[in-house]
Amino acid sequence: MKYSVIDISSSSISMIAADVTANAAEIVYKDRASLTLLHYLEGKSLSARGIDKLVEAVMVMKGKCVSLGVDILYLIATASLRAAENFEQVRAELLERTGLPVNLIDGPTEAYCDYIANRFYSSYERAALLDIGGASIEVCDLSEDNRENMISLDVGIFDLHKKFVKEIH
């Protein structure tokens, strides 16, 4: 069976497709497109233009899933949409215009997903993972399978840039 996940983040939309059997998952396709949703915020709400850009990007990725013969497709979103005050409107627009329900991943689950995706990549006995995203930062202790050692901070690189960078030369 072929599965795919389309991931809406603060600075991009990405897709991964895999052939999954009882014993293994083989990645057959990956793609990423730049889309900085934070540029489309009006206050703390995603603008109509931002929603249109998001729908367009999701439809492009969904089309690739159709071309690949994907059986099951998940659309997920993290901090970029967690922070949007009009998330329910964005969710409804995405469902109506793409046919895909949005699975909103909360901060602790995002940190746990980072842990699961990276736990076998450490060659050190004690290692930490720092995932610096556009709207959140996740920190995981890769040496322990304990959710209490995984955190998600509601601050990201765009927040840090806004606070600490006055100008770029």
Tell me the role of every PLM-derived stretch.
Residues S45-D52, R97-G99:
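Glycine-rich phosphate-binding "P-loop"
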